[in-house]
Curated annotation (Swiss-Prot):
It comes from the Eukaryota. Residues 1-12, 108-111, 158-174, 228-291, 344-360, 415-432 are cytoplasmic. Expressed in jejunum, liver and lung. Expressed in testis at the blood-testis barrier (at protein level). Expressed in ventricular myocytes (at protein level). Expressed in kidney. Cys-415 near TM10 is a major determinant of nucleobase transport activity. It is a multi-pass membrane protein. This is Equilibrative nucleoside transporter 1.
């Protein structure tokens, strides 16, 4: 009876807003790690000035090789990637977990807007420091503090967005995943353009950081526009109501009447305003979504275990000494290839959601991704110690990477979409937060697994 009165998402405005928010969660951090060469170059120079260093094939290879002095590879530069991973993964896990328990006590608007503003501030400071000279140790410490802050607020932002999308129809988690996929594509293109242009490291890095600021500002504006969307308000009010009130709430909205609490409740509400029945047991929710939660965790464990630790070490077998081998093979065949097909996989869930949320095929397909571990490890990886190179030709690697990336994007997006729909509407936000935690757990486990897989090649 009431379904005919449900508002439509006019011009797909809410869908597009969540797409931009998804882009805003990942693009800043992707640009930050894309500028790793800029950070290590500043740590490698005694005066900490990288303003005159050009980005070239030679400098890219040198910075990737710990045995190369450039002019002298400092101890801070040598440990940069390991410490960066630690400073990124620990806050990501801790704050995603905290958000699962505290999201009802801290308002949603504070968590999302506060996180976006904090990330914006960090990137403004980062862009400013490109032009500031300082000693290597101070630069290293400040950079690690920024990494902790970006990932702490990024974890809160991502978990809160997945929780917010959980109160909408299932396919509204897809634009967040798709936006995150597009972030990877943008950074890959930016990396290739920077290498091709031979631009100074500082100029490329400054461009990355300013672009990140612009995207975060756009995400803030989009989030502020959400309360004006009737479609969004409709599902938010439905979620705020208890199960017995939902039918009445639908009728009130369809007749143009404001539910009790007026327009104020129609804004971007904080979980502290939710009724007591939202305080559901975490264990009960986990019992409903554990298969999907473990699935998304396993997906990202396999993905990060191989990409980029193993895949970025593959070299072209057909290019000889051409620029394709030395400059473009890894940026194109590895990073761009992965990000394009990952984005396509994530985006496909907007129009196709097979298999269904209760289908046994979903966890089976997730488990089948383990086959990519031997396939990619048997490609033409540099410095093989234990495994032969059975798939030497570039076509094998490019094909495996495309399937690897597409399955990652599609299956992960399905799991994230279905998780909040396996529970009651009042539990959807908590379920979304829990799914986000297991996603981050998969990233952390994958980072640990990557050391083992690389050592076994």
């Amino acid at each position: 009876m009431t379904t005919s009165h449900q508002p439509q998402d006019r011009y797909k405005a809410v869908w597009l807003i969540f797409f931009v928010l998804g882009l805003g969660t990942l693009l800043p951090w992707n640009f930050f790690i894309t500028a790793t060469q800029y950070f290590t170059s500043r740590l490698n120079t005694s005066q900490n000035i990288s303003l005159v260093t050009n980005q070239s094939c030679e400098s890219t290879e040198a910075l990737a090789d710990p045995s190369v002095s450039l002019p002298a590879r400092s101890s801070l530069s040598a440990i940069f990637n390991n410490v960066m991973t630690l400073c990124a993964m620990l806050p990501l896990l801790i704050f995603t977990c905290l958000n699962s328990f505290l999201h009802q006590k801290v308002s949603q608007s504070l968590r999302i807007l506060g996180s976006l503003l904090a990330i914006l501030l960090v990137f403004l400071v980062t862009a400013t420091l490109v032009k500031v000279q300082m000693d290597a140790l101070s630069f290293f410490i400040i950079t690690m503090i920024k990494i902790v802050l970006i990932n702490s607020f990024g974890a809160i932002l991502q978990a809160s967005l997945f929780g917010l999308a959980g109160v909408l129809p299932a396919n509204y988690t897809a634009p967040i995943m798709s936006g995150q996929g597009l972030a990877g594509f943008f950074t890959s293109v930016a990396m290739i353009c920077a290498v091709a242009s031979g631009s100074k490291l500082s100029e490329s890095a400054f461009g990355y950081f300013i672009t990140a600021c612009a995207v975060v500002i756009l995400a803030i504006l989009c989030y502020l526009a959400l309360p004006w969307m009737e479609f969004y308000r409709h599902y938010l009010q439905l979620n705020l109501a208890g199960p017995a009130e939902q039918e009445t709430k639908l009728d009130l909205i369809s007749e143009g009447e404001e539910p009790r609490g007026g327009r104020e409740e129609s804004g971007v509400p904080g979980p502290n305003s939710l009724p007591a029945n939202r305080n559901q047991s975490i264990k009960a929710i986990l019992k409903s979504i554990w298969v999907l939660a473990l699935s998304v965790c396993f997906i990202f464990t396999v993905t990060i275990g191989l990409f980029p630790a193993v895949t970025a070490e593959v070299e072209s077998s057909i290019a000889g000494t051409s620029p394709w081998k030395n400059c473009y093979f890894i940026p194109v065949a590895c990073f761009l290839n992965f990000n394009v097909f990952d984005w396509l996989g994530r985006s496909l869930t907007a129009i196709c959601m097979w298999p269904g949320q209760d289908s046994r095929w979903l966890p089976v397909l997730v488990a089948c991704r383990v086959v990519f571990i031997p396939l990619l490890m048997l490609c033409n990886v540099k410095q093989h110690h234990y495994l032969p190179s059975l798939f030497k030709h570039d076509v094998w690697f490019i094909t495996f990477m495309a399937a690897f990336a597409f399955s990652n994007g599609y299956l992960a997006s399905l799991c994230m979409c279905f998780g909040p729909k396996k529970v009651k509407p009042a539990e959807a936000e908590t379920a979304g937060n829990i799914m986000s935690f297991f996603l981050c757990l998969g990233l952390a486990l994958g980072a640990v697994l990557s050391f083992l897989l690389r050592a076994l090649v």
